[in-house]
Amino acid sequence: MEWDTVIGLEVHAQLKTKSKLFSGASTAFGATPNSQTSFIDAGLPGVLPVLNEQAIIMAIQFGLAIHGTINDLSVFERKNYFYPDLPKGYQISQYQKPIVTNGYLNIQLGNNLEKTVHIARAHLEEDAGKSLHDAHTDYTGIDLNRAGTPLLEIVTTPCLYSAEEAVNYLKTLHQLVRFLGICDGNMQEGSFRCDVNLSIKPKGSSVLGTRTELKNLNSFRFIEKAIAFEQARHQDILERGLSVIQETRLYNPDNNTTQAMRGKENENDYRYFPDPDLLPIDIDKEQIEEIKNNLPDLPEAIYKELKNTPSLNDEDINFILSSPDTYQYYKKIKSLCPAADKTIINWLKGQYAAFLNEHNLTFETPPISAKTMAAFLSKIHEKKISSSIAKNIFSMLCAGEEDIDAIIEREGYQQQNDNSALEEIVEQIIKQYPEQVIEYKAGKEKLLAFFIGQAMKQTKGKANPEQINLLLKKHLG
């Protein structure tokens, strides 16, 4: 029997606020356990939550970016369940009236195919604390530093049908929240976590199967593997005439399996009710319009713009959109030397990216300012310096020098354009390599690059390669 896989995703994006959702405690990662915990986070009696306005603004930004509906009235509710790292005995979340509903995100599937992923809702909630099982051998520790950190939970409809589509959507969403500046997207630190809801059904059937939830996946590779395993597990169960149990499961990357964690709860199990300590959020249209007018450049619009740039291919575009900092750096350079598109991207994703990787740097704090890099790339594009000399100058710029003209003057890097002098060099090379000349004339045209290389070597990279190319073709016939 053939089967269809149906997937819905819930993403928890940690918002980049300096303080928590309902307290003034810091959200900085990696602090000493329980050093960033307020009375509210610890669930002590007699304290009241105070809503972080910045989290509301970030949620609205996201809602606008996914073309969603920003609800003018939004309500916080208590989600009741017991867990050791949830000291209040409930989580403040949103259920009946979330802040964002009915949005969508377009994803690129290759071969110029596009798919629209429907986002049912995005709501605010506080994160729970963390259980530390490995810190002690005879008991589990509780760290409440994360408790109360603002999360935006982003929930799709069950409209994804393969691991490839799911991961593609997650990468697109990950890119969006980083470009919006609302989430750093650091999956290793848990800033961007995903729950996968998966079921399978007979091919063509309109009736969904029993779903399982894969909890807290924080790696695109693990998500892909977990989905593949769970698909196969469901299929094996059903083809043996058994029933899939609705439950929450954990993915174990060590042996590439999933294992049961607990029975999957339904909404009624959480006994949601409006939090009496928090007023409903009233969002007016003027506030939404102001936020909309201040949205940054978004990846989908940037992609379409870059796609219309003839000199850029998909690999170039993906590199430019790999991070907001990369895009902003590229954008600044492009504005200063607009004609040098291909030169810019070749250097950024080639020599420059290699240097950054080697020195564990990013475009967030580039060693060369955009202004200096633009001046440098302009000289390459205008053929004022050769590629070999450009590499030497680039190393000096990375070391902190900024005045390119001063470097060229000091090092004697001025390009040699004297036609008669270059012609003399070409004649010498042709006399020096008679066998290669015979081979070239016999049809081995690739040897032209050899002759150009010899000319560049003799001039220490100062010769104009285009002039050398023309002179060689003239003399070689």
UniProtKB/Swiss-Prot annotation:
Can you tell which superkingdom this protein's organism belongs to? Bacteria
* One of the GO biological process terms: translation
Instruction: Look at the named UniProt entry and state the broad enzyme category this protein falls under.
Output: ligase
Q: Which Gene3D superfamilies match?
A: 1.10.10.410
| EC number, UniProt record | 6.3.5.-
Instruction: Share what the entry says about its subunit structure, partners included.
Output: Heterotrimer of A, B and C subunits.
HAMAP family for the chain: GatB
Q: What is this protein called?
A: Aspartyl/glutamyl-tRNA(Asn/Gln) amidotransferase subunit B
